[in-house]
Design a protein with these regions (language model features):
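Thiamine diphosphate
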Residues: 1-166, 171, 183, ...
Length: 320
């Protein structure tokens, strides 16, 4: 599907639909929230299955610890809150109570990144991927759009061990409807568009911007491969190494700090396996601020033009 024909949808209703599907078919599914059921997408589940939903109020640390206890009895628990609250505030509980015993707690973090807009720096979680991918036994997933969010939730329910799923607040382009995107598997990246001159690696809402950038580059006779890196940990190293060797240069794009985010994870793979020019498009080492989402994306360098410029830069450095 071309960028000009994309529909825009929020990801949280997709999370809600997936929870309802799981609730109707699997009695071991339990959901927890922290005073934000309507905002994060767990409200419908709480109404349909009140005996399997727990609202902990503004007590995220208690939520995660209790979810670990519930999971230790054989349940599969989905815990959800804003990304700022269910990562940094509860890091000790995630590490000690969830990851160390490798329990089936799935943390769905909403309102991630700077696209929460006016909520400002205190609510703009831009370092969560760095925190979560550092934890042993933690799997990290960042869906590109609503359809992929639904698939990711369903896949997480079947995946053994802790899973962190990051989604945003804003409406995002529905870009994963092509035939190559029908099958979703945790740990597997998807080639969204083939190309020979440069590889654009996107995650989350930046996948759509990578596809738009590829369209712009094509106008200048630059053939860009686009990879949707929906799983940040474990990385699909094979597809990244193959792309690096075949195109000779890579640009990564993420709505996250460049410090230890997806781009850093990709760089670690390349430095050991395929030395090619690389450019990371992401949020500089700084906090966010209040503003309209599009204005913030422009200020922090997360636009289609930034990706296009990055592509021209790595192609020039590659020297062919």
């Amino acid at each position: 599907m071309k960028p000009t024909t994309w529909n825009y949808e929020p990801q949280r209703p997709a999370f809600s639909r997936a929870l309802m599907a799981l609730g109707n078919t699997r009695k071991e599914i339990v959901v927890a929230s922290a005073d934000l059921s309507s905002s994060v997408g767990t409200h419908a589940f709480s109404q349909e299955f009140p005996e399997r939903h727990y609202n902990f109020g503004i007590a995220e640390q208690n939520m995660i610890s209790t979810c670990a206890g519930i999971a230790s009895t054989g349940k599969v628990v989905f815990a959800s809150s804003f990304a700022i609250f269910c990562t940094g505030r509860v890091y000790d509980q995630i590490r000690q109570s969830v990851c160390y015993p490798k329990l089936n707690v799935k943390i769905v973090a909403t309102h991630a990144g700077i696209t929460v807009g006016g909520d400002g720096a205190t609510h703009q979680m831009i370092e969560d991927l760095a925190l979560m991918r550092a934890l042993p036994n933690m799997t990290v997933v960042v869906p590109a759009d609503a359809p992929e969010t639904e698939k990711a939730i369903l896949a997480a329910a079947d995946y053994e061990g802790p899973v962190y799923i990051r989604i945003g607040r804003a409406n995002v382009p529905v870009c994963t409807t092509g035939k190559d995107c029908q099958d979703f598997e945790i740990g597997k990246a998807t080639v969204m568009r083939d190309g020979d001159d440069v590889t654009l690696v996107g995650t989350g809402i930046m996948v759509a911007k990578c596809l738009e950038a590829a369209e712009e580059l094509a106008k200048h006779q630059v053939s860009a491969r686009v990879i949707n890196l929906s799983t940040i940990k474990p990385l699909d190293e094979r597809i990244l190494i193959k792309a690096a060797r075949e195109t000779g240069c890579i640009v990564t794009a993420e709505e996250h700090s460049v410090v230890m985010g997806m781009g850093a994870a990709v760089a670690l793979v390349l430095v050991e396996n395929a030395h090619v020019p690389m450019k990371r498009v992401g949020i500089p080492d700084s906090f966010g601020e209040s503003g309209e989402p599009d204005d913030l994306m422009a200020k922090y360098g997360l636009t289609v033009d930034n990706i296009v410029d990055g592509a021209h830069d790595v192609i020039k450095r590659r020297g062919r």
